[in-house]
Amino acid sequence: MVHLIVQLSKYIMIILFLIYTFLCFHLFKYPDKPKKQKHIYNLQRFYMFLIHLDGFLVLFVTTMDTKIIGFYIAQLVLFESIYLIYHKFYKNASELVLNNMVMMLCISMIILTRISFDKALRQFVFVLAGTIFAFLIPLIMQKGTMFRKLTWTYAGVGILGLLSVLVVGVASRGAKLSLTFGPVSIQPSEFVKILFVFFIASMLYKSTDLKQLAITSGVSAVFVLILVASNDLGGALLYFFTYLVMIYVATKKFYIFAGGLSFVGLGMYAGYHLFSHVKNRIVAWLDPLSVIDKAGYQVCQSLFAIGTGGLFGFGLGQGLPNKIPIVSKDFIIAAISEEMGGIFAVCLIMVCVSCFLMIFNLSMQMKDAFYKYVALGLGSVYALQVLLTVGGSTKFIPMTGVTLPLVSYGGSSLLSTMIIFGMIQGMYIMQAAPEKRRNIDDKRRKDHETKNRQKQTAKEPGAQGSQQRRRKPAAGGKNSTKTQK
């Protein structure tokens, strides 16, 4: 009976997620129909909560652990609270971005609970903290006016944060990534990437001449080189490509982008010969089976999980995701593919695609050049992080150690991504506010003009007398008719 429930639920979950993903892109068909959009948003939320319920129902049936029921209820209360607060205070926020954020958090809670209940519980605590940031940041962005003026503050704080990891950071798998404070570990590069985007945006906002570009490139190189020195090559790639995209869009000079790609190629060649762990990752990428007992073990296990799961997966609780090293972080997409199916994993990737399409669309709509660059940079960070994670898990690119935003286990990654989504919502609200003010001003102007016309009509000399004269001939006409009779 349990096996039947698991198998039935996986097909239901795939169908629901297919519909949800279709609606993400179907929305673009109705840009000027708010009622139609609202209906689609409500449908998305309905399917999302059904997926959430389906996943935790299966987890409970397969384990019969009552803690799962309480954990599910706590999540449901939190997610509903997110919607209530956003709808109450941020009416101009993007509903699609909000839906996608909660959808990915639902999937994260389902798969992490399947892998390790303790990890899922710790992740939920970080979700609570991230929710506070997601609520406060749009308000701060609306009230704050100094963000574009803090150029060197962003650079200084960011470089100090990365240097602290280089000097006193804890090494993990050959790279210095985090600072440890008792039981808590913080990965500063996850937060510094936001400061990095704000630094470049504020520099490009001031000017895009050759001198300004040279200064921007020099400081950006310091960020990247510190990450390289820390052996965090995944982070270095993320920062460098974000810089490259922002510079290319600001200058519209393709040779800069092409030169940057060439520089990446040279950097990878140098890294192959200078860093042993980089060499191991490239060897594992080119032929993982030849080193399956060493560097290729992670990639091989990931590919085995994706391949054996097939299109529909084994069902929650029926696979072997814990056989994959670091499955809850770097290879979460492999665990999802194995148990929820390849179709479900592709839908998740497409939801990520719809997110950064919305962010890039926001960047094009922003009138303020500073926030235009900020949205572009944050969208690039998000898109590149998804690409590096999925690409590393599927052998499309060498493994980089980057996590899947909002889905993978990790407090620093989760908090930084929820901060980014809060900033995106803040910019959506800022972008919608001028349009709202224009509509209000137009209404007030029309009302004022109508009142003026009414006053002028009432004050016109002889207006009442002319009306009486128009009525008197009519009365005289009746009397004269009677006289004639």
Q: Where is each model-derived feature located?
A:
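Transmembrane helix-loop junctions at the membrane interface of multipass transporters and ion channels
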Residues: V2-H3, L57-T63, S116
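Select subsegments of transmembrane alpha-helices in polytopic membrane proteins
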Residues: N42-M48
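P-loop potassium selectivity filter motif centered on the GYG triad
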Residues: F198, L204, A305-G315, P405, ...
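Hydrophobic alpha-helical transmembrane segments of multi-pass inner membrane proteins, especially
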Residues: D65-K294, A334, E338-G392, I419, ...
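Hydrophobic transmembrane alpha-helical segments in integral membrane proteins
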Residues: M1-F17
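A juxtamembrane structural motif centered on a specific transmembrane helix
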Residues: T389-K485
